[in-house]
Structures are given as C-alpha cells and as structure tokens.
C-alpha cells in the first residue's frame, strides 16, 4: 500500500470528499450549503483543552506492591499509564502522567517524598522502551529517567535502598533472565547502573532492600527466595533461601521485615516464614495462616504484623513475635482477595484487592471501599442526557453508575452478562446494555431492576442507541445487522420492527437523525450506510442524505469527521468518536491509548488537535457529559475510566 492512503480528493462539482482508509475509497458528501473545501488547508486545533480531573480504577488484578500512604495523607497507586495520588479524606486526586504505557510497579524513597515507577514497552516508537521514572510526589517533577535500553519487556519490581538514605534503586525486569539491576539514580548522567546480573529463570514477584543492612536485597518468586549482597566492588552475589525438607512452596509470594531485621515471607502454601537476619535459613514457620496464597505481609509501626490472603480474603494480625492475636477480618468476596496491605494513620489500613478495589478501615471496625474499579475490558460508556451521571459496562459483568461531581460510584450491579455497549434512553429514564452474547438488557437506574430482556443473534451487540423522540431503539450487532425496535410504556416494552440488511461487515457505530426518521451506520470494513428507521430499508442515494441533521456524531466515518483520520489510516486507528452537545468539539479515542480533541466540524483532511495520554490500551469509548463540561473516556484492557475537564 502506498503512502497516499489518506490523500483526500475533493470534488467541487458535487461537494464530495473521497478519502481512503486501508486502501478502500470512502466517498463522503458535505451539506449542500457547505463552502468549497481546500484540502491543502490546515484547520487549527480547538481553543478548548482537556485537563485530567479524575481516574477511576486501580491495577490490583495482576500487579503487586502497588499501594502506599504518603505523609501528605495521599495514597499512591497506579492504573493504566497514570500514577494516582488520592487523598481519601479530602476526596481529591493528583496525577503523575510522565509514563507512555502501562505502569507495572512503584517504590517509595525513604524520605517518603520521592517515588520511582516502572513501565512496560510502549506503543510509541520513540518511547517504546520500558524504563523507570523517578519523580517528586509534591511537585510531580521528573528527577530521572533510567534503564531505557537496559530493561527488557517491563519493570516488574522496584525498591529504594533504605539503610543509606535511598541513594540506590534496584529493579527487576520481565525479560527471560529477570535481570536485577542497581542504579545510582541521582547521578547527573541520567543515572548510572552500578551492577546487573541474572536474577532467576523463573518469575520474580517482589524485591526489597533490607531496611537495616546496607547493600542487602531480598527477591522472591516462583519456587525461590534469594538474599543478595552488593559488595564493595559493585558485584551482586546471591544465596538462595534453604527450605530443607520442609514443604517448598510453588511460589514465595510476598516479603516483609520485622523490627529485628528478620525477613518475613508469605507463600502459596498459606505459610509465613521468618528468615533470620543475615542468614538464608528458616528461623520460624507459621503454617496454614491462609487457605491459598499469602499475597501481602505488612509490618506495622508498633511491631505487629498483618498478613492478607489472596484467595480467602482474610486479614490476620500477629504480634511482633509472629504469635497470632485473636484479631482478624475478612473482606467481602465481591471486592476480591487481598493483593496488598498498606499502613494508614493510627490503626487505619488500606487494602488493595485482586478485583481492582481499594478499601480502607481497621481490623476492629472493618473496611469500606475508597476506589471501585472494573476488572476486565471496558467497552460500554454512556452519559445520562438528563443528569450529571454516566454509566460503564464491562466484560467483568459489572454495570456501574458514576457521579462525576463527587467522583463516586452511585451503584454497581452484576448483570450476569459481559457488557459490550451502553445507552441511555433520550429522557434518561432507562439504561440499555448490549452484551457479548447477543442479549440486550434494559435497567431502571433508580431501582436497578431489569425492565426488559431481548436477544438478537449470538454475536456481541456493538452499539445501541435510542432515537431522540424515544420511540425507537437501534441495536448494531457484530453479525452485520442493525435491529430496530419500537419502544412503549416508558421504555419497558419493546417490539421488533425488523432488521437492516446491507453491511458486509460488523456494525461499529450508529447515529440517529434529529427527527428520529433516519439512521447512519459505520461497519468494520469502513462503510457509511443510511437507513429509513421505520421500514428498516437502506437509502442507497447518499446525496439525498447530505442535509439531514444528526442528533449525534458517534460514527467516525462521516463528512463532519474527515479530519479525525490520520495520514495512512488503517481503519483500526480510531475506535470511538463523539461530538459535544453544543457542536463545537469532537473527541476521538484510538488504538494507541490517545484521546484527541478537535474543533467540530472536522471537515479539513488536515486538522490539528490536542492529544492526551493516560490510557495504556485501546481507548474504546469517549463521551461528553450533558453540559459539555467534562469528557469521560474508557480504556478497554487497561480497565480504567478517566474524566477530563474541558477548559
């Protein structure tokens, strides 16, 4: 395919623009009163900009050591490519956005102000290398960028030295040798790697500098715990922990230290083991603390120790000698198991869970959620047309209603089906959810009860949209059909009018006309087709539709969105498109984690935009809230939702 994929050709005679997506020509007709276009002209970006206001979600499903409390009262954690600093008491967030792809680990400097975070390889060719960023948590200024070109695949673990005041930073990567490297991160020459060696052929899940002994590092993972020494000539050597005849675990899953400087490890057998300071031998074993793996062991200020079960969800309190106390707690199963325990103020604890929630509370009174997240791909997103609310639907079967002003979950419901798409009725009275199975369900947002249930085909329902007059709903399926239903009885009764046949690929997006008579739709092979909604017939003359006023612009392939397509677009670039209710802005989400903001209409093939990172996966849906004050974006596989203020 030549480089002229997106060379648009404008035909002055009929006011049409021919553009190519993946070599396929698409002819788009402008309104009859549209001024003649000069395709060479460059449209400026909008005056409005986006500012990241809130990030919903937390990555506890598959990452460890990812939750800490700072002296500012903020908890620090990550999701997607953002490190979040969240003050739970004051309900405010700040964000470190220096990363270009998934953040996989963080470490806190002994001064409790400096943070290191490590990422995986990125989409951007320039920033494709996995690397470590060291930054100031007060100013959010980046202090050092380390390891680009050294680190393979991703940074798995990070730890600052503690006995010497944090001059060294150790990292373990996710390459085949799980290389451990030690960095003098403050060196002016972008940090200096002082030592590097193979750590283990097996997975490494945790690494910690010893809090009292200089140049001692402990790592653990599949079938091993290793005690490392960095000697005077900067050579790393290790002694493996000796399990002797005792039942060697499949995984050593977490590390901690007691006040004497002994190492405490938790493992997949549910045991806690104390390794005497400076040795590689077992001093004490507490068996069967948890059924299933111990995912976190946390030493508290007064010397007590809390362990958390990844499977059983139990939190067990021990005294300083690792004798069990009578105190334990269990977190509710729907929040997941315990991923990490972080000590808060006083007796307070923060708990990160395996279902991407963060809970806070104490062992006596129990725990409440501070962060609720999705745990699988998020595709469904829709803004309430009547109230400042939005709803998200996910492959984890959760439907969640959010209040963007208080940044809180109004409710979360397990609908028993993997959700693919969401829509509100035009009056905001119901929420329709398209599912992966071909089912689509309708819910009352106040009672949360299901009011209707239908099935169309066995493929995912990719998009669902009510007509502006609320009399119809259109359901676009992966089976290439659009199903049209008549809507009665306050959106609780649905009767099928028919299905629209004509697309040769799956339906991706659709819009209704303002008068509720017509539908336009895009498909997986980049078609734009028009339909008479009540007859379900295709309108084969696109010129007859050029002056129709559309109630939305969710279809990215339209005359009004020509300029959102980049040069050499291969069609998979843009997953989602929307326009603001005042018709001044268009927003898109792409396969590279980018959210873009354009001035609407985007009719110039060369249109400049403002571009924003934060998501690390494909951005699956973007929607403006009803007053256009904010844009909400869904991050697909990164499981996050992000809320941006339009400034």
Summary of predicted features, one role per range:
Residues 2-647:
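WD40-repeat beta-propeller superdomains and closely related acidic/aromatic-rich repeat-like regions
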């Amino acid at each position: 395919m030549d480089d002229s994929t997106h060379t648009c050709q404008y035909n002055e005679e009929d006011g049409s623009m021919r553009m190519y997506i993946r070599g396929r020509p698409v002819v788009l007709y402008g309104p009859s009163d549209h001024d003649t276009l000069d395709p060479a002209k460059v449209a400026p970006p909008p005056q409005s900009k986006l500012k990241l206001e809130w990030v919903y979600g937390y990555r506890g499903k598959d990452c460890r050591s990812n939750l800490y409390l700072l002296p500012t009262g903020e908890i620090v954690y990550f999701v997607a490519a953002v490190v979040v600093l969240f003050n739970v008491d004051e309900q405010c967030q700040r964000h470190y956005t220096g990363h270009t792809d998934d953040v996989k680990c963080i470490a806190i400097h002994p001064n409790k102000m400096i943070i290191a975070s490590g990422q995986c390889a990125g989409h951007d060719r320039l920033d494709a290398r996995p690397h470590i960023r060291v930054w100031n948590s007060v100013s959010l200024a980046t202090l050092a960028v380390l390891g680009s070109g050294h680190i393979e695949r991703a940074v798995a673990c990070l730890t600052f030295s503690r006995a010497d005041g944090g001059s060294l930073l150790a990292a373990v990567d996710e390459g085949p040798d799980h290389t451990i490297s030690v960095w003098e991160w403050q060196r002016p020459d972008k940090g200096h790697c002082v030592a590097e060696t193979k750590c283990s052929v097996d997975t490494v899940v945790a690494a910690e500098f010893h809090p009292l002994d200089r140049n001692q590092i402990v790592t653990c993972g599949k079938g091993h715990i290793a005690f490392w020494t960095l000697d005077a000539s900067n050579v790393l050597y290790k002694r493996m922990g000796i399990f002797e005849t005792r039942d060697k675990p499949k995984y050593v899953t977490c590390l901690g230290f007691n006040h004497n400087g002994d190492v405490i490890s938790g493992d997949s057998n549910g045991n806690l083991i104390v390794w005497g300071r400076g040795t590689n031998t077992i001093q004490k074993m507490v068996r069967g603390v948890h059924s299933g793996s111990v995912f976190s062991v946390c030493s508290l200020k007064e010397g007590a120790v809390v362990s958390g079960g990844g499977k059983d969800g139990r939190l067990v309190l021990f005294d300083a000698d690792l004798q069990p106390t009578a105190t334990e707690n269990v977190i509710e199963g729907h929040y997941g198991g315990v991923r990490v325990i972080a000590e808060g103020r006083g007796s307070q604890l923060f708990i990160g869970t395996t279902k991407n929630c963060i809970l806070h509370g104490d062992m006596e009174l129990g725990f409440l959620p501070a962060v609720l997240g999705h745990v699988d791909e998020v595709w469904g997103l829709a803004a309430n047309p009547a109230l400042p609310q939005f709803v998200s639907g996910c492959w984890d079967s959760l439907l969640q209603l959010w209040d963007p002003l208080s940044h809180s979950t109004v409710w979360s419901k397990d609908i028993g089906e993997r959700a693919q798409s969401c829509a509100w009725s035009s009056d905001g009275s119901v929420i329709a959810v398209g599912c992966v199975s071909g089912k689509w369900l309708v819910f009352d947002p106040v009672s949360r009860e299901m009011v209707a249930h239908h099935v169309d085909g066995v493929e995912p329902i990719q998009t669902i949209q009510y007509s502006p007059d609320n009399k119809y709903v259109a359901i676009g399926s992966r089976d290439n059909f659009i199903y049209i239903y008549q809507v009665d009885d306050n959106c609780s009764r649905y009767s099928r009018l028919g299905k629209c046949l004509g697309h040769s690929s799956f339906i991706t997006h659709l819009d209704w006309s303002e008068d509720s008579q017509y539908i336009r739709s895009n498909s997986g092979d980049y078609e734009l087709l028009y339909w008479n909604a009540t007859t379900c017939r295709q309108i084969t003359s696109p010129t007859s539709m050029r002056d129709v006023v559309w109630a939305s612009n969710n279809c990215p392939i339209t005359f009004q969105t020509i300029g959102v397509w980049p040069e050499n677009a291969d069609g998979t670039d843009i997953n989602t498109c929307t326009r603001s209710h005042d018709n001044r802005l268009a927003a898109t989400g792409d396969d590279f984690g980018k959210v873009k903001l354009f001035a609407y209409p985007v009719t110039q093939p060369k249109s400049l935009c403002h571009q924003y990172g934060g998501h690390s996966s494909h951005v699956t849906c973007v929607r403006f809230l009803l007053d256009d004050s904010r844009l909400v974006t869904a991050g697909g596989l990164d499981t996050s939702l992000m809320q941006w203020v339009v400034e």
